[in-house]
Amino acid sequence: MKKLIFTGLLWLLTVTSGKAQEIVFAGYFDVATGSPENTEVTGRIHLESNKEAPSRKIPADYRFEILRQDDRPLFRVETQFDACGRIMGIFRVDEGESTGLQEKTCRMEVALKSGSRTLQTFPVAIHITRQTLWELCYERYLPMALSQGRLYGSKRLSDEKVARLIRQVTAGNGRFQGFSCYRPLPLKFQYTPKQKNPSLKPLDDEWIQVCNLIGGMGRAYCLSKVYGTEGDPQARKALKEALYQALLAYTSCVPIEGDDVLINGQPIGKYTGDGISLLHNYGLMNYSTTTHQWKLSDPLVVPALALMPDILEGIRQNDSTSLRLHQSLIRYFQLFTSITEKRREIDNPEQRWGNLTDTLYSAGAWADANLGHRSRTLLALPLIWGDYNRPVTYVPYWYSSFYHNPPFKDFSFSPGWSPHGVMADVSRWMTKFGIPAHRYGQSGFHPDGTVSHHIGHGTDAAMVAYGFEWLTDCSHGFSYFKDTDFRIDSPYYQFQLDRLLEVYPFFFYKGQMDFLVAGRSYLSDLKKFVSKTYLQAVKALEAAQSRDTRLENLDKLKAVAKEISKNRFECSGTRAYWVNEFLIHRRGAQEKPFYASLKLKSERTVGIEDFSKVRKSWHGGYGILQLKVRGDEYDQQVLSNMDWHALPGLTEEWRNDPLPAEGGSQASLPGANKVAGVLADGTYGMGIYHHLPQETYSSATALKSYYFLEDRILALGSHIQRLREGQGQAIHTFIDQSEFRDTLTWYADGRLHQAVPGESVAAGIHTTKPCWIHTGEKGYIVLPSHRIRLQIRTGKEIHVTDWEIADGTPNFIVALEHGIHPGKEDLDDRYAYLEIPNVSAAEMPQHLQEVLQDLEYRCASDSIHGVFSRKEQIRQYAFFAPGSLCIGGTEIRSEAPAMVMLKEDEAQWTLSVGNPAPDGERQTLRFWSSTRLPAGNYAYTPQGVNRVKGECIRISDYGTGSEVTVELPDSRDASQYHYQSELYAASPLVIRIPKASGSVEYRK
């Protein structure tokens, strides 16, 4: 375990006196040019021990004193204690002085004294500038805040509604009518654990409502024609006074300190923040609010910012109301950094952010995609504090000094950081967006380019909701700190740029994002995500650069964004996103365009998260295979009219009852299967998947594999069985479901059939011979093993899952029936079918003949699948278990589950290997080939966004063939793989083997 040592920055000065130790926060100060005498400098001196107030107050004889100024004595320092007993050092322009009109920096030496005794001296630099940092950040952030509904409670109040609320607040001394949450502190409750008291109801329901009303009034104060900056002065004054009253009344009744709540006469906790973060333990607060604190902080941002210039000016004028409100806001916003008790367990690997003491594998507290949500309030805090050096929080467990004893002495709740001044603190949090995941079931960015957030059951694919915000919301912070002393370093920009360039465009086809990895946004407008959200992120990143920011490939990103904006973006390739068991196979750069993708899941991963009232995405991840040519085959409208029991690629019982509604967004759970994986060499790809659902709604099990050839996809299935009783319906493999807008043609048993849009068809055709289906630009070829029943459904024959969102646009479904009890009926308990893009119905007979002549495929002993294309000279093997398979004249025998692709060209072999059952511990994968390959040690570089040095594949002669030993990434190699070896264990490993002697060419 790596021990983390907290290192003080230059402006954190340890002050020692006897047994007492003080850490001084004096990082940044500025004042405007032309400031007259007595003008307060922005930025105050603070002590870390201020966090212990009000329970432990700073000694009353502490004071600050300027010992020396480089220039004439331009400033003086005053010592001030607030109502909680916290000490501050306040600089002012000295009497008879002015800062002048020239920008410069004044340096001085300051002492912290206890009476007449000097405890420590420290340097201070005061910047005299035309615009203070506070003014600059305020100018930048207020418009941004007004553009985000959450920061004013998403309340766009009419002027009439605002007038009514002003009257309510004025009459109620700051209180809105109809709320019971305005109770004096401490709040007192009786609680018996064995018998929950029904009178103890969540307090946050009303708090959130009050926050949102205040937020709406704050927005009106900024933007209303009557109450806004250009509105009626008297009306505006009335709203301002009402906001002061409403904020004071509300913030003063929300418990923050541990003794603000008494349970059975005892304080609920002993730390700042406990007053709110522990309420859930007693049924007094909803857990989601406890962990999503921005629900209570965000709505007050706009009203607080709108009033802040007046509040700070009021403080300068010794206005008691302004001072009380400011102190109440600082107290209230401590809830934002309060953490629920369970998540404070720093050495518990099961808690939200893992074992925080293991800094090699955990990035600490808040290491998840909710940092995008948190950043909204974070960026407001320096402006609300009106100070640069007051720490971002007084919640004590965020400080290294909180951890006194070995082995956790000097531990940091977030590695490498302890609060030391809000401006520096928030700047630092803007660097915590690109957090890597080190293991399955951990939030973070994966080496394959995907990202996970909700990991309660397994690794998820959150490429739109949560993940995209985690990647890009930092641009607000980059812009906020642009060209300041707190600007963000270039590598943090580069992290985002690399993924905007190298990852996301590959998921876009014809202006549409792939719904299979969109997370909870799967049913949103994913065309808008591409044309607006993504393109805005590119522009925001470019605009957020400081003058000294250095980025690679920015011009390339801008060129790609331009092509996307004109809906002209095309690319070709096959990529495996192996951590999330997802693969994309597409063409379009120089070929007829199409896009195919495959999503699997396993005991390591989950499918599509679903927060819908009517569950739909239950089967997402169960071997789902989609093929797009036009680009809108699975858009928002198609998905809204879908039977979600019949996703393309799925093998399952075709039920017609509602999908389970209970159990949360990931109730579909990970699979119970170990074997699932994807493999790609850049041109070709494959997937292997043992369908073995853990949840009890699904009824089937199967061994499934997928083979992505140049312009065809072959899907094989075997060992299809009933796993559970289910609903008693037949088990099917669904070939496709999409909008029924073109003639649907199918040829089976020597007969041609057609259905036209608007026609409702329910056809079941038995056949023992190859058949084909066609619609639009896509064709399907089905190759029976013995006897199949081809199912065609269109129009009203489709059981739409959610009629509330359906618009009546009909879909079609093509499926293969395996019977109620596969293997026990006169229907195949296996399947083989192809999907072919860019084909007409007239061309399908020719394609069928070409397939029969070109492809050799087998399912050996049900547990090994393989295919050989004579035309493309590629062999692909899927081993669900140890065994051997001969295909295309080459036998491969594997000692473990594996994926193997062997592509032969005139001058070289391309060998690709994947481990579909990664555990991070397996050291080698070994197999034998009857075809002899040139012997040698061939180094490989694992695939991914950022390439790392890999290991090697050893090929040695074995009889007339070869023995191949693949050195896998494993736990011994943790540091080599940046402590992500568990994730790299499933990475596609690709080498090129020259047929002639000479140097080896490595695939990059």
Segments predicted by a language model, with ranges:
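Hydrophobic residues embedded in beta-strands of well-ordered beta-sheets
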Residues: 73-75, 87, 713-714, 909-911, ...
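Mature N-terminal, pre-catalytic/accessory segment of carbohydrate-active enzymes
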Residues: 20-206, 994-1004
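Positively charged n-region of N-terminal signal peptides that target proteins for export
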Residues: 1-4
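Solvent-exposed loop and beta-edge segments used for protein-protein assembly and interaction
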Residues: 35-39, 58, 81-85, 100-104, ...
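Bacterial N-terminal signal peptides
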Residues: 7-14
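Extended polysaccharide-engagement surfaces of secreted carbohydrate-active enzymes
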Residues: 470, 477-939, 943-958, 971-989, ...
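Aromatic-lined, polymer-binding surfaces characteristic
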Residues: 136-146, 155-522
